[in-house]
Regions:
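Ferredoxin-type iron-sulfur electron-transfer modules and their immediate structural context
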Residues: 1-93, 100-174
């Protein structure tokens, strides 16, 4: 429980920035699950996600070794000293499926599939781990910040917006932040 005095700085009704990151509403029926065998590491899925719940992550060997058991990784194309994973915050996802729709996949098979939220609840621990890792500036420099692939390795400043599922406006706002 919180005492009323904890809210004295917010008597005017303001809310601090970034608090949506703690909501974890779990409102989607189905959420994307990543299949690395079909991934070409284009990052289009992260690019179109209105809520920034799906993110590419470059991991050092040490970070990959310390990852929660079961987290899937690939060698990062073009930078073999890093591992690559596509991390999904299932509890922040709205289930719109934009990421799956845009995924080119490999050999006719997509790298993302929508699966039941309850069945994929374990995926949240991977996101919770990767979101705390530092941004790799050398990865952004290699893939260029002005490209779809490179831009998605940066932490978005507009995340978990709460907009309607599949909103077409928030990806643009997310991108310019």
């Amino acid at each position: 429980s919180l005492p009323v005095s904890a809210f004295k700085d917010y008597v005017d009704g303001t809310t601090p920035s970034g608090t949506a990151a703690y909501e974890k509403r779990g409102i989607a029926v189905n959420v994307p699950v990543w299949n690395p065998e079909n991934c070409i590491q284009c990052n289009r899925c992260a690019y179109v996600c209105p809520h920034a719940v799906i993110r590419p992550v470059a991991l050092t060997a040490e970070e990959a070794a310390n990852a929660p058991e079961g987290m899937k990784t690939l060698d990062l194309t073009g930078m073999k000293e890093y591992k690559f994973t596509m991390s999904v915050s299932a509890l922040d996802c709205t289930g719109c499926g934009s990421c799956v729709n845009v995924c080119p996949g490999k050999k006719g098979a997509k790298a993302l599939a929508m699966e039941n939220l309850e069945a994929s609840a374990d995926e949240q621990k991977y996101f919770d781990y990767t979101v705390k890792l530092p941004v790799k500036e050398d990865v952004i420099a290699k893939f260029k910040e002005a490209t779809v692939k490179g831009s998605q390795f940066k932490q978005p400043l507009l995340e978990f917006s709460g907009a309607c599922a599949g909103c077409g406006e928030t990806p643009y706002a997310k991108l310019i932040t």
